[in-house]
Regions:
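Juxtamembrane helix-entry segments on the extracytoplasmic side of multipass membrane proteins
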Residues: 6-7, 32-41, 64-70, 142-167, ...
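Transmembrane alpha-helices of multi-pass small-molecule transport proteins
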Residues: 31-82, 109-110, 167-174, 188-207, ...
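Helix-helix packing/entry segments at the starts of transmembrane helices
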Residues: 10, 41-42, 80, 84, ...
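Single conserved hydrophobic/aromatic residue that forms the stacking wall/gate
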Residues: 1-5, 9
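Hydrophobic/aromatic residues within transmembrane alpha-helices
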Residues: 29, 39, 43, 90, ...
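Transmembrane alpha-helical segments that form core, pore/gating elements
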Residues: 24-27, 51, 110-112, 116, ...
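Specific transmembrane alpha-helical segments of multi-pass solute transporters/efflux pumps
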Residues: 18-23, 52-103, 139, 227-245
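Hydrophobic transmembrane alpha-helices of multi-pass small-molecule transport proteins
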Residues: 51, 113, 122-144, 199, ...
Length: 312
């Protein structure tokens, strides 16, 4: 059991690491010919094709109830359309630093929604873990002096990034039972199919005027990474965790993204890794550990059948 749990945590870490790399790579791609709406289209269409191909080549042929097909539509709106559109367009307007700061709100919003809709207890460990993780993430983001000095924020972009976090938090909270009923590939192929149908009518003009021949090969490589690694593979890994873990734990791994950004910054010579960065990383991992150790609603019911006292 511990080995299986460890594997799930590793997948969550890998997914968030891919999303951490997506911000600088996606921002660079949008600075060299790929518009924000075009990148959203590539992500939706590319991932839909990948998941359908995986379904056809593998053993993922599942019958989906008509009601669940409708539910997949709404799940796709929250997890893909609102989340990806708002974040990608927001990233094109604001700085990667501001976008990263806004992502730290996801665990907080998810904890509140899980308490309201799933009756998950807001325990001391959970609150302390989220607080430690947020402080660590903010230290990493704001400690990147080069990015902080050269990144210009934009209120509209920041609000779009915040909307993306809120929509994904609602998705994590409301659709957990639906996701548990089907394989990851079945869930994703329908969600991305619906997302593609909704997105393309609004983005096809951007695709039509895209200067395909003038876009450098490096930009296409960055776009391919965003589509295949940060969308297709990352969603597979994230969904595996969503099926087994509580929503707040899944969202806590969002704090891994600033760590990846810090590593990239140091590797490219744009940042340094000192004691403050080391302390920030420890705070992030300590926060994630505290949340994973916090007791769920089921745990508290087992310990106190007559009541649930959120003290740990």
């Amino acid at each position: 059991r511990s080995s299986a749990a460890s594997d799930v945590y590793k997948r969550q870490f890998a997914a968030c690491a891919a999303w951490g790399l997506m911000s600088p790579l996606g921002k660079d791609a949008m600075a060299h010919g790929i518009s924000g709406l075009a990148l959203v289209s590539f992500r939706a269409v590319g991932a839909a094709l990948c998941f359908w191909l995986t379904s056809l080549l593998g053993r993922h042929k599942e019958d989906v109830a008509p009601r669940d097909l409708l539910m997949f539509f709404f799940a796709g709106m929250l997890a893909i359309v609102f989340n990806q559109c708002c974040f990608t367009i927001g990233l094109s307007l604001t700085s990667p630093v501001n976008a990263s700061i806004v992502t730290t709100t996801l665990p907080i919003v998810t904890m509140i929604l899980a308490a309201l809709f799933l009756k998950e207890p807001v325990t001391n460990k959970k609150v302390l873990g989220i607080f430690c993780g947020a402080i660590g993430a903010l230290l990493l983001i704001l400690g990147n002096g080069h990015a902080a000095q050269n990144g210009n924020g934009n209120l509209t972009g920041d609000l779009l990034c915040l909307t993306a976090q809120c929509s994904f938090a609602v998705y994590l909270t409301i659709f957990k039972k639906l996701i548990q009923k089907y394989t990851v590939v079945t869930c994703m192929k329908w969600m991305f199919t619906y997302a593609t149908i909704v997105i393309l009518p609004f983005t096809y003009k951007d695709l039509a005027i895209l200067p395909w021949a003038e876009i450098p090969a490096t930009t296409w490589f960055e776009t391919a990474f965003v589509v295949f690694v940060a969308t297709y593979l990352a969603y597979i890994m994230m969904m595996t965790g969503q099926k087994l873990l509580r929503p707040t734990i899944v969202s806590m791994y969002n704090y891994v993204q600033p760590i990846v950004a810090c590593i990239v910054s140091v590797a490219t010579g744009l940042g340094v890794f000192g004691w403050s960065q080391g302390a920030a990383v420890l705070l992030v991992f300590g926060g994630v550990w505290l949340v994973t150790q916090s007791k769920s609603r089921a745990d508290l019911k087992t310990e106190h059948p007559s009541h649930t006292d959120p003290e740990s």
